[in-house]
């Protein structure tokens, strides 16, 4: 006989009801009676119809998949309670397969429901193994989402201690507003449920239905991401036709929610340990990052660092500039002094020593002299017409127009030049009874 003492106290306090099913060779009557009394002590129903029953499902018929949904007792129990745990005691020689979701109606109500299936050969062995259930919170949890008949072996679902939960995809969308009480290490998506209807490209003509379907599918992806623990996996099963198109859309939405592609080695190890009997091919596997979106990372460094733009200097770091020049070495001086043009045949274009101004003054004086003595004559014959008709080097530039053959008289007076202490002539020209004064402009 199985004793209720193997149930940890904290396990019963967190469990609203326990459903025990097993082979006919196991006597569960006493355990069920103890479970009834303990459950009533832990949770007193407010009304009679809220009483949480714990039924004794003894016999091979309860090991058949088709017997669960048609059994009247199971339907009554399912309509009055919200189980958080379903424990199945299975002898080692039995083979139990929960295909379809016979327990779907019972497990779909709370998002934290779990299905535990243990193999035991004797009651004593069971008592020894069930002591490990006190560490239920640390056991890996796997959630399977499917709306159609799918072969999922609950008895052989894991080689290690794994809590396997099978839920309908629409259930997590209905409970999306509630905060998840349990986070899963892995979520296997076999089907997207009703949210996949009208979500493909064939329904884009109906804008209202298409938008509603895409919104439902986005809510489904958000609910899946909330149920996955940090570092957990999301397995997206492959398909064909419309299902494949929907799963590709789900993959894109899951990536939008923050999932990243998982490495093949990590996926193979997780599937081999916790989902060895999954026949569906995996189209894509995502992993939830361990970091949260929008969270600033703490930088490791000196907290007493100076703000940007502030340099921490020390007096010993200053260098005397005079020590950088060796007086014994000869350096090529940069720039030119006032006597630098003396060695050149012509003054520099940007001369600052005054040589250029002196040469220009001497050149003007030479032109005046040649003009007065008649050494220079017009080569073009247009000098008398004015500056508009004179050449660039015409000595008459700056003078008014005059008649051909008219004599032009120049009176020279000495004036001090503006730079270098040199003298420059200022000529006063009388022409047609008009006095013109040249103040050093080019002629």
UniProtKB/Swiss-Prot annotation:
Alphabetic keyword roster: 2Fe-2S, 4Fe-4S, Cytoplasm, Iron, Iron-sulfur, Metal-binding, Mitochondrion
Principal location listed in the UniProt entry: cytoplasm
GO cellular component, one term: mitochondrial intermembrane space
Highest rank taxon of the organism: Eukaryota
Example GO biological process: iron-sulfur cluster assembly
Chain positions covered by the region annotation N-terminal SAM-like domain: 136-301
InterPro entries for the chain: Anamorsin, CIAPIN1
UniProt-listed PANTHER family: ANAMORSIN
Protein's name in the database: Anamorsin homolog
Species: Toxoplasma gondii (strain ATCC 50861 / VEG)
């Amino acid at each position: 006989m199985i004793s209720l003492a193997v149930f940890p106290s904290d396990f019963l306090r967190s469990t609203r009801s326990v459903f025990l099913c097993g082979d006919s060779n196991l006597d569960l009557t006493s355990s069920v009676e103890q479970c009834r009394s303990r459950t009533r002590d832990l949770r007193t129903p407010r009304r009679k119809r809220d009483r949480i029953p714990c039924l004794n499902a003894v016999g091979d018929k309860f090991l058949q998949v088709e017997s669960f949904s048609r059994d009247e007792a199971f339907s009554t129990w399912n309509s009055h309670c919200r189980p958080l745990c379903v424990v199945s005691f299975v002898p080692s020689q039995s083979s139990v397969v929960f295909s379809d979701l016979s327990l779907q109606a019972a497990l779909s109500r709370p998002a934290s429901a779990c299905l535990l299936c243990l193999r035991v050969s004797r009651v004593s062995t069971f008592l020894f193994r069930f002591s490990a259930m006190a560490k239920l919170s640390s056991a890996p949890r796997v959630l399977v989402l499917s709306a159609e008949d799918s072969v999922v072996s609950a008895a052989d679902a894991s080689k290690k201690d794994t809590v396997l939960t099978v839920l309908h995809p629409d259930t997590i969308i209905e409970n999306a507003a509630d905060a998840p009480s349990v986070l899963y290490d892995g979520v296997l998506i076999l089907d997207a449920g009703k949210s996949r209807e009208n979500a493909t490209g064939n329904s884009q003509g109906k804008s209202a239905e298409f938008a509603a379907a895409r919104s439902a599918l986005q809510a489904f992806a958000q609910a899946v991401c909330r149920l996955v623990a940090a570092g957990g996996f999301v397995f997206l099963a492959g398909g064909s036709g419309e299902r494949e198109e929907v799963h590709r859309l789900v993959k894109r939405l899951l990536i939008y929610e923050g999932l990243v592609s998982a490495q093949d080695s990590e996926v193979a190890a997780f599937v081999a340990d916790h989902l060895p009997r999954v026949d569906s091919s995996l189209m894509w596997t995502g992993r939830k990052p361990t970091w949260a979106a929008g969270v600033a990372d703490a930088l490791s460094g000196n907290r007493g660092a100076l703000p940007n733009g502030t340099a921490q200097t020390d007096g010993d770091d200053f260098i005397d500039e005079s020590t950088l020049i060796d007086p014994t070495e000869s350096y090529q001086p940069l720039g030119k002094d006032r006597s630098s043009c003396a060695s050149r045949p012509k003054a520099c274009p940007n001369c600052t020593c005054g040589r250029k101004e002196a040469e220009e003054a001497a050149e003007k004086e030479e032109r005046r002299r040649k003009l007065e003595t008649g050494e220079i004559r017009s080569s073009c014959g247009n000098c008398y017409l004015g500056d508009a008709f004179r050449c660039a080097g015409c000595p008459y530039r700056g003078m008014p127009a005059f008649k051909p053959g008219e004599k032009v008289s120049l009176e020279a007076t000495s004036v001090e030049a503006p730079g270098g202490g040199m003298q420059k002539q200022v000529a006063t020209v009388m022409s047609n009874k008009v006095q013109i004064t040249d103040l050093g402009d080019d002629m």
